[in-house]
């Protein structure tokens, strides 16, 4: 079958795919069409083209081999939650946490925007696999895009190209993604270095397993394998198929006895998730490796335990705040190069810099392309600037990240950024209690999403608020159901808070690599080696059971970090009740029972 604009024959005989591509060509009207094969030649060709075009700046080959800096349009710098839609067949299925529009109405509206939106541009057909390509029943996808920057990002973030296309084969299932930056070119019209459109839509059709995105070239809005597929669409698939798609890191912790434990952790953005994923333990004999830094797909193994797979192939991390002290392994991952940077600053010797990175440059070109000095009064890198780098370059990448069976999960952590109330570490009483803890997880507002007031407390159930692809009440029910199915083989669940402050406003706990002391306590609990204090919020660690050798912090500070004040929790009760009511009538009775249990314990502790 010939496709208009494609040179030669299509490299697939999958009729459903070919028909879909033909419809897309008809709709978008691109100048040419190309199937991406994921090869190095293709990467080099795209990079060369984008450097020539001014979209990418090639970095110093010695310092940053095969690496590039992109500067986006200043209006296109983060996920736009207000323009993100879950277009399930009924509004009830989208629930109160998602924007909803009738799917037929949305398709009609988007077709108008898509119509001719690739004029003067090349259409790229990007086949990709979520998780290891060796998986006997892999989750596959195809993104159709007009952004070569997206193609390069997808090559890092997924197993992309010919192998994935071959996996789909003649009749394999795949998630369909359509993406256009929404900037058609008339003959002779000069192109922008970062084409995008003021009108933006990131829409999901969960029942049809489709994603349509328009107007943005940035990160999670455009790299559809990331949050769109790996969380929003996958969470709907997981509910239907009996697994879980979660916004969690996957960490491998190795004890002095050489026993490996796998820990998943869900933190809202800017709460130290990537730092924990690549933690370097400070306590003797303990080691850690990373399986994933952002997303975990959890399923039951043959032995009835919960196993985690990282569906991604790269890290897409926030650059500012990353340095050799806070996250040495992320920095070392970038040392071999092959990295795509977005909206960081450029040094005079063609290298990259961002706030809190080592060195004090006296002159830079900032993320907007302007001259910058320390007196400029603005940040040189955008607060949500990014590095995109292959996982395999991380010196502590666990080999299991390529194992389609996944890794057995010993513990799940929830954590937010709370200055008060929440102790350093507490164990949930059981799975239903854990679901309640996750459902009411809250954090101080950060600037990693494009909207919302910084500093306010934001509820973020399981750190999934922007990513649940269906009704949040049904999502909590799915957690309860998975717990019922897994029984006593479910992982233990813990609530952590690295960010507790004293009355004078200083952090009580040092965080970063020292968090390994908390991880050790968690393992000690799993192995039955330590007791805990039963508090209103769960089983809280006792000071004497935390390994404190070599810690600079005082005993007084650590005791305060571990403390549980029922009066603080009483203050949280009204907030939690309001939140659960907002989530609507589908919130499981088990979660309300846990809320009542907390209320009763707080009352009894007065």
UniProtKB/Swiss-Prot annotation:
Protein's gene: pckG
Source organism per UniProt: Corynebacterium jeikeium (strain K411)
Assigned EC number: 4.1.1.32
Highest taxon in the source lineage: Bacteria
Localization (cell): Cytoplasm
Function: Catalyzes the conversion of oxaloacetate (OAA) to phosphoenolpyruvate (PEP), the rate-limiting step in the metabolic pathway that produces glucose from lactate and other precursors derived from the citric acid cycle.
GO cellular component labels: cytosol
Name of the protein in its database record: Phosphoenolpyruvate carboxykinase [GTP]
GO biological process, one term: cellular response to glucose stimulus
């Amino acid at each position: 079958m010939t496709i208009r604009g494609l040179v030669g024959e299509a490299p697939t005989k999958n009729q459903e795919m070919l028909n879909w591509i033909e419809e897309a060509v008809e709709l978008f009207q691109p100048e040419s069409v190309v199937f991406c094969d994921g090869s190095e030649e293709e990467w080099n060709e795209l990079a060369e083209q984008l450097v020539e075009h001014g979209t990418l700046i090639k970095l110093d080959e010695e310092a940053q081999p095969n690496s590039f800096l992109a500067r986006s349009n200043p209006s296109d710098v983060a996920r736009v939650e207000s323009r993100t839609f879950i277009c399930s067949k009924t509004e009830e299925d989208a629930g109160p946490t998602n924007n909803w529009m009738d799917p037929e109405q949305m398709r009609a509206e988007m077709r108008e925007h898509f119509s001719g939106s690739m004029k003067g541009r090349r259409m790229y057909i990007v086949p990709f696999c979520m998780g290891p390509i060796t998986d006997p029943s892999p989750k596959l996808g195809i993104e159709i895009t007009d952004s070569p920057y997206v193609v390069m990002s997808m090559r890092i973030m997924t197993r992309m190209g010919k192998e994935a296309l071959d996996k789909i084969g003649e009749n394999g299932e795949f998630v369909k993604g359509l993406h256009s930056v929404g900037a058609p070119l008339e003959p002779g019209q000069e192109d922008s270095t970062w084409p995008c459109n003021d009108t933006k839509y990131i829409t999901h059709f969960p029942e049809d397993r489709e994603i349509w995105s328009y107007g943005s070239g940035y990160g999670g809005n455009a790299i559809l394998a990331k949050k769109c597929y790996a969380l929003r669409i996958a969470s709907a698939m997981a509910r239907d198929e009996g697994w879980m798609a979660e916004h969690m890191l996957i960490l491998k912790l190795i004890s002095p006895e050489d026993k490996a434990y796998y820990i998943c952790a869900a933190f809202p953005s800017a709460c130290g998730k990537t730092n924990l994923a690549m933690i370097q333990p400070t306590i003797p004999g303990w080691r850690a490796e990373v399986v994933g830094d952002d997303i975990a797909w959890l399923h039951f193994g043959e032995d009835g335990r919960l196993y985690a797979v990282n569906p991604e192939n790269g890290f897409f991390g926030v650059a500012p705040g990353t340095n050799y002290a806070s996250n040495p392994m992320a920095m070392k991952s970038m040392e071999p190069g092959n990295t795509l940077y977005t909206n960081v600053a450029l040094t005079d010797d063609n290298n990259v810099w961002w706030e809190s990175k080592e060195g004090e440059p006296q002159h830079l070109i900032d993320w907007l392309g302007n001259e910058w000095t320390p007196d400029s009064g603005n940040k040189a890198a955008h607060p949500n600037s990014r590095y995109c780098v292959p996982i395999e370059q991380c010196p502590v990448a666990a080999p299991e990240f390529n194992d389609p069976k996944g890794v057995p999960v010993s513990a799940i952590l929830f954590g937010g950024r709370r200055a008060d109330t929440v102790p350093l570490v507490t164990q949930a009483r059981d799975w239903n209690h854990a679901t309640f803890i996750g459902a009411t997880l809250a954090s101080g507002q950060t600037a990693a999403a494009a909207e919302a007031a910084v500093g306010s407390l934001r509820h973020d159930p399981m750190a999934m608020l922007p990513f649940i692809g269906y009704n949040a009440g049904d999502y909590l029910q799915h957690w309860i159901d998975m717990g019922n199915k897994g029984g006593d083989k479910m992982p233990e669940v813990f609530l952590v808070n690295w960010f507790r402050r004293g009355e004078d406003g200083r952090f009580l706990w040092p965080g970063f690599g020292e968090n390994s002391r908390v991880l050790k306590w968690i393992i000690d609990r799993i192995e039955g080696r330590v007791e805990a204090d039963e508090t209103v919020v769960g089983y809280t660690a006792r000071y004497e059971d935390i390994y404190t050798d070599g810690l600079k912090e005082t005993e007084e500070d650590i005791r305060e970090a571990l403390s549980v004040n029922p009066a603080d929790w009483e203050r949280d009760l009204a907030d939690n009740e309001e939140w659960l009511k907002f989530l609507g009538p589908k919130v499981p009775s088990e979660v309300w029972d846990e809320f009542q249990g907390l209320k009763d314990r707080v009352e009894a502790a007065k």
